[in-house]
Structures are given as structure tokens and as C-alpha cells.
């Protein structure tokens, strides 16, 4: 089991916490991280793109000119894909981009993402963040003190004041343990766990038996 230092919001050491080796110290397999990250990105796609093919574009029923005798190239419809204002060939149509990934693989990928941040020494445990006011400037000051530039901050549960204070700071994302995802971890260079989140993350896997 790994032991990491716990810091307060002023970046002063305030203790240590032990991280479960079966959650934070497993072998990282890039192909599994890639699979789950792609699945999560695909799930975000609306898939509402659409174009009009020959079947849907209006007009074009009449032959523009007779087949022979005009000197022009033959044409059967003014809605042909090669005409201006015509239909689209092989364009996109609405579709569902999601694909299934087994729950055990998703769970394994999340452990790998957490392990990758610990191995890269870019995981920090912070005792807690208490702001005098729910203002962006106060959160920005704490982030600057902790040296956070592109960081995912994980709270054990929803905190409206922290959410409101952090949402406009570029590069910082505040989330909760139940919304923690592989994609979000990989998108950020730093991972910050508020102290209560460590136990919640480990309990999340215990409940699943993963």
C-alpha cells in the first residue's frame, strides 16, 4: 500500500493517508484506458447530424432538358449530387455512437487511471478546501497556492459553494466521487482528492466487488 502526504489548502503537510494498492497501484494497460475513454467520448455524441439525399431533397422530378439535340451533357434531374443545390452523396445520417463496455472493464480502467496519476506523482490529497466566500477569486488563490494548473479536483460529495467558485477557472474541474470517470482523469494532468474522497473512492470499488 502506498502512503501519500496530506496537505491543507495552504500546502502545509497535515498528515498522511494510505491508499489501497488494489485501487491505486495496479498495472496500467493503455489499450483498456483507450477503450473506455473512447466509449465515454462516444456516449457524449448527440449523433443528430443529417443531410438530404436524393430521397429527401425537394424538386428535381422533371428532366431539365431533352436527352438529345441541345448540345449539353445529358441530365435527368436538377437535384443530382453534381448540381448546385442538389442532394448529398454518402452524407451522415442520425446514428447512435455508443458501444458497450463490460462493467468490470470500466471499473478496471478507472483503477488504472487512478494508478497512472499516482505513478506519475501527479496525485495530491488535500485535507479540505474552506473558502471565506463562494467566490472564484478565493478558489483561484487556493489553486495557485497548491500549484494547480490543469487539475481534476474530486470531492466526496456535492458542494454547491465549491462548485460555484471553481466553475469559471480555466483548466480546473471539480467533480464528485460518484461522477468520477476515466475520461476526466486522463484529460487533466493533476488529480486532487479531497481527504474524504479517498475513502469514498475505495468504498466505491468495495461495493462493486471489483
UniProtKB/Swiss-Prot annotation:
Task performed by this protein: One of the primary rRNA binding proteins, this protein initially binds near the 5'-end of the 23S rRNA. It is important during the early stages of 50S assembly. It makes multiple contacts with different domains of the 23S rRNA in the assembled 50S subunit and ribosome.
Gene Ontology biological-process entries: translation
GO molecular function terms noted in the UniProt entry: rRNA binding; structural constituent of ribosome
This protein's name: Large ribosomal subunit protein uL4
Domain of life per record: Bacteria
Assigned protein family: Belongs to the universal ribosomal protein uL4 family.
Cellular compartments per GO CC: ribonucleoprotein complex; ribosome
Subunit architecture: Part of the 50S ribosomal subunit.
Keyword rRNA-binding: yes
Span list, region Disordered: 57-78
Keyword Metal-binding attributed: no
Keyword set, alphabetical order: Ribonucleoprotein, Ribosomal protein, RNA-binding, rRNA-binding
Amino acid at each position: 500500500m502506498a502512503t501519500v502526504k496530506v496537505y491543507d489548502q495552504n500546502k502545509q503537510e497535515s498528515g498522511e493517508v494510505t491508499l489501497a494498492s488494489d485501487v491505486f497501484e495496479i498495472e496500467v494497460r493503455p489499450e483498456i484506458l483507450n477503450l473506455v475513454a473512447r466509449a465515454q467520448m462516444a456516449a457524449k455524441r448527440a449523433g443528430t447530424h443529417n443531410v438530404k439525399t436524393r430521397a429527401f431533397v425537394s424538386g428535381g422530378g422533371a428532366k431539365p432538358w431533352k436527352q438529345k439535340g441541345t448540345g449539353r451533357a445529358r441530365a435527368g434531374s436538377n437535384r443530382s449530387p453534381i448540381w448546385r443545390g442538389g442532394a448529398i452523396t454518402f452524407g451522415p445520417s442520425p446514428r447512435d455512437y455508443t458501444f458497450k463496455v463490460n462493467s468490470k472493464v470500466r471499473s478496471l480502467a478507472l483503477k488504472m487511471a487512478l494508478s497512472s496519476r499516482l505513478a506519475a506523482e501527479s496525485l495530491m490529497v488535500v485535507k479540505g478546501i474552506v473558502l471565506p466566500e463562494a467566490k472564484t477569486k478565493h478558489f483561484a488563490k487556493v489553486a495557485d497556492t497548491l500549484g494547480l494548473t490543469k487539475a481534476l479536483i474530486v470531492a466526496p460529495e456535492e458542494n454547491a459553494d465549491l462548485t460555484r467558485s471553481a466553475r469559471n477557472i480555466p483548466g480546473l474541474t471539480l467533480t464528485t466521487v460518484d461522477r468520477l470517470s476515466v475520461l476526466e482523469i486522463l484529460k487533466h494532468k493533476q488529480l486532487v482528492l479531497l481527504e474524504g474522497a479517498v475513502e469514498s473512492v475505495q468504498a466505491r470499488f468495495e461495493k462493486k466487488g471489483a
